């Protein structure tokens, strides 16, 4: 393809819209109990798997932004082990926060991709330690306090991060 021929990197956000639909939180017990529309991990992992097949077929260089699932780390590791020219990052908050923060409809924890499970958090940290994840990003998306006042599912996703990322 064109990108492979000119040596550019394609930056990808991996989320299958048919699976994510109108979801706003990780598919889990808390979201289920609160009745919030969910985004299963499969929305990310299926998108990554599909992109990796295209990357393998075309030879393009690609960067996956904002990983949130432990299973995504495994897919990227397999791709790198196969010699595919892929890199990835994780948002800082995915390394420190989990879906537990949405308990009580805490809209300050409304981010996209959503905060995932404790297990996902640990696998993301492990992927970073092992060099599968190449870098940490801020995903700095501050919003006014009024943007977080509506019912959880109606609030905008976003979190401030730059002020805690830079010393």
What function would you assign to each model-found segment?
Residues 1-136:
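Histidine/acidic residue-rich metal-binding segments in metalloenzymes
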Residues 10, 149, 159-162:
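Generic intrinsically disordered, low-complexity segments enriched for polar/acidic and small residues
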Residues 44, 154-167:
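Gly/Ser/Thr-rich active-site loops/lids in small-molecule metabolic enzymes
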Residues 138-145, 161-167:
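Active-site anion/phosphate-binding pocket segments in diverse small-molecule metabolic enzymes
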């Amino acid at each position: 393809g064109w990108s492979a021929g000119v040596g550019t990197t394609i930056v990808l956000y991996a989320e299958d819209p048919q699976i994510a639909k109108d979801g706003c939180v990780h598919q889990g017990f808390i979201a289920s109990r609160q009745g919030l529309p969910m985004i299963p991990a499969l929305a990310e992992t299926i998108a990554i798997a599909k992109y990796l097949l295209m990357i393998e077929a075309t030879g393009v260089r690609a960067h996956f932004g904002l990983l949130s699932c432990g299973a995504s780390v495994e897919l990227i590791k397999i791709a790198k082990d196969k010699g595919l020219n892929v890199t990835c990052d994780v948002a800082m908050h995915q390394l420190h926060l989990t879906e537990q923060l949405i308990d009580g409809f805490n809209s300050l924890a409304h981010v996209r991709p959503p905060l995932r499970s404790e297990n996902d958090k640990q696998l993301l940290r492990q992927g970073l330690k092992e060099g599968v994840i190449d870098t940490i990003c801020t995903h700095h998306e501050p919003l006014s306090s009024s943007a977080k006042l509506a019912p959880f599912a109606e609030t905008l996703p976003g979190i401030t991060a730059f002020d805690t990322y830079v010393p």
